[in-house]
């Protein structure tokens, strides 16, 4: 259903596909993480933290766990010392990439307005 088809019928935004999508990618960091993983994957935790910069280790860990639980991020552990863990996008997350491209295009058009 399109947005117009829900007009006047929705009592709770969480009951819509839009609400479901926001529950997966909403928040301050999830889209940033998905964007960075789309640019450079697989990527290790510390490299992801370095690229984001202002996120805390605890928050990054929490956001990655949520994205993994929602099926958007894969976590691969390597049995070695020191431990090595890499993160990458799932196929499900890959279907979000055209939306990210559209957001980037919107930003290009509107950034300086």
Swiss-Prot record:
For this protein, the record's PROSITE patterns field holds: HTH_HXLR
User: Which keywords does the record carry?
Assistant: DNA-binding, Transcription, Transcription regulation
UniProt cross-references to Pfam families, sorted A to Z: HxlR
**What domain of life does the UniProt record list for this protein's source?**
Bacteria
Could you confirm whether the keyword Transferase appears in this record?
no
HTH hxlR-type domain ranges (all copies): 16-113
**Native species:** Halalkalibacterium halodurans (strain ATCC BAA-125 / DSM 18197 / FERM 7344 / JCM 9153 / C-125)
Q: Which CDD domains match?
A: HTH_ARSR
The entry's protein name is: Uncharacterized HTH-type transcriptional regulator BH0655
Q: Does the keyword Isomerase apply?
A: no
Gene Ontology MF terms: DNA binding
Q: Per its UniProt record, what InterPro entries does this chain match?
A: ArsR-like_HTH, HTH_HxlR, WH-like_DNA-bd_sf, WH_DNA-bd_sf
């Amino acid at each position: 259903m399109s947005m117009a088809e829900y007009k006047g019928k929705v009592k709770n935004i969480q009951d819509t596909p839009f609400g479901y999508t926001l529950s997966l990618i909403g928040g301050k960091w999830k889209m940033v993480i998905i964007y960075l993983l789309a640019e450079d994957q697989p990527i290790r935790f510390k490299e992801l933290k370095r690229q984001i910069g202002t996120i805390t280790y605890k928050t990054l860990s929490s956001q990655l766990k949520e994205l993994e639980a929602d099926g958007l991020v894969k976590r691969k552990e390597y049995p070695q010392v020191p431990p090595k863990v890499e993160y990458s996008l799932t196929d499900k997350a890959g279907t979000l990439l055209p939306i990210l491209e559209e957001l980037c295009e919107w930003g290009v058009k509107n950034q300086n307005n």
